[in-house]
Amino acid sequence: MTNDHPQPPAGTRAEPPGLTGSPFDSDTFTSATFVTVGRGPYLAVAAVWLVTRVGMVLLLLRDTLGIGGVRREVDLYRYWYGQFAQGTFPPGDVTWQYPPGAGLVIMSPGILPWLTYVQAFVALTLIADAVVTAALARADSARLTHGTWIWVCGLPLLLHLPLARYDVQTTALAVLALLALTARSTAAHQLGGALAGIGAMVKVWPALALIGTPRGRTTREAWTAAVVAALALLATLALFFSDSLGFLRQQGSRGIQIESLGGTALALAEAGGIWPGRVAFRYGAFEYVGPYVSSLGHLALLLTVIAFGWLLLWRVRAHRWTAATPLDAALTAVLLFTVTSRVISPQYMIWLLGLAAVCLTSRSTVMRPVALLLLPAAALSSLAYPVLYDHVVAGTTQGLTVMVLRNGLLLAATLLAARRLWTSTVTGPPEESA
């Protein structure tokens, strides 16, 4: 086998790869591009994780940045906790829009009775965060890829918001599912499928972790385990709690949230004086109301269906699978469903950062440039909420600029991910049989 990378003469020290060209597709593009960790990569990860998470906790304790009130979501969780204690899912609550498995996360602070609800929730979120970090680092024990660093350094770009939402726990299920699916054993495939199925019962999107499983035995094992785990969890919750499917009643009337791509289009139209709508607080979020909002919502649903159809077409046409294909497909799928959604909450970036980090644990991934686009998108999401959220709601020049840039990056990342997934698996040469 020939080596395209020239080796230094014996007795000389190799210099780091030059970055005069684009580093995105280079096999030598590693974590050193972001952070130099010296001889102790695991200690470096632990140190950076500790420092950044302490900073996030301090921000949450003060909770005065921008409009403040990020922690209010946990207070809502605590209210729902009281409903679960009475043996029912929140009845008739328009803000409860989550699958029944989310109830387990909401109830989980009860296992730490010596702490307040908020303290216990934050502690469990940090534990889930640490588990994701450890799993990413362990995914390649020979060297720390920049996947670990994307997660450790990317999550704090969202400031303290990840500690006040249950999306870190959901992302942990998806990350662990994908890492299990990369193993070769039946038990690992079944574990990955079960974790994805449980994740789908918590927040739906982790089911997309299975979209890229290789055809044949792996798909049968993983998808069967996912269905069994999801149905078992659903049946168990329905047995012990009433109104477990009540969340379905709260989904149909959702409008266009101001942070979605459709919301940005309406904001630009309003700023240009060609749309007479307004912003209203509905279903626990700020949405646009006015002419054409319903039509735009239907268009978003149509685009979601088209995105799903594209994923099915990709799966049928794909003929080249690498170790990274299931990871790349999961990130692409979640990006597609994010940008076509009527709702893009800031915590969606937690999902995308986690999936990007998993992709970058594999040398064969084609998602490196996509992951890099997500980092500034995460930082802009923090500007949108909570730092400049009053400007976003009011539709000022500052608010519009932030949303156009953030959603532009998300759209670019989605199109780039779809193109690179397609070209690497459909238009590339067929994979040779071993």
Kindly label every feature range from the protein language model.
Residues 79-82, 92-116, 256-291:
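Short hydrophobic/aromatic helix or loop-helix immediately within or flanking a transmembrane segment
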